[in-house]
Amino acid sequence: MKLVHPLFSNFLHSKPYLIVILTTAATALILIPIPLVGDIGFEFALLMALIATGGTGFITIYLVFQWRFYQETKVNFLSLVCFLLPLSLSILILPLTFILVKSGFSGFCNFYDGLAFFVLLPCVTTLCSAAVALLCSLLAHNKLRATILFITIILGSIGTSIYRLLIHPPLFAYNPFFGYFPGPIYDEIIVITPTLLIARGL
């Protein structure tokens, strides 16, 4: 008896999943030499959240349509959702590993805050993005329409936050996808506030 259904085990070797894994890993490697973002902290977490948004949506839509149209899967919806949660988070394993190794050699600066930002921003973002992509996949009739709907929602959400920041520069922005941005003018040291915890918890 197989512990993992072929639908799931095959997906872990599929091209879409490997592309997303390599993209997030490559992004982390590109960011590492760059000052400010090349250490585990808010800036690195923010950029990884943006990358993870698209990556998670891409693999979620692909997997859901595999599930919908592969009639012999016999996988119920709950099993699909339970697989999606760790799957979404798995795309962040290599970026986190790379930045921890780099930060370990260069000397950790605010390690616990940086790790907390990584959990609160990209990790929570992947779960939110997976949920939205799942909904889009269930509502749309094909991958293209699901992808267009997903991108429209993401751009609409992020665009609204950017518009608010442009109109009111001193303001900060909370967003389900990129997480949090303290505004164009912010202190060098960004701390985790109860408001951020509540916003990401919701």
Model regions and ranges:
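Membrane-interface helix-boundary motifs at transmembrane edges
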Residues: 68-81, 137-147
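Central hydrophobic cores of alpha-helical transmembrane segments
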Residues: 144-159
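Membrane-interfacial interhelical loops
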Residues: 34-45, 94-117, 155, 159-199
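Alpha-helical transmembrane segments
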Residues: 58-65, 130-134, 160, 202
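Transmembrane alpha-helix boundary signature
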Residues: 61-70, 99, 103
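Alpha-helical transmembrane segments of integral membrane proteins, especially early/N-terminal helices
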Residues: 6-22, 48, 78-89, 162-169
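Hydrophobic alpha-helical transmembrane segments
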Residues: 1-67
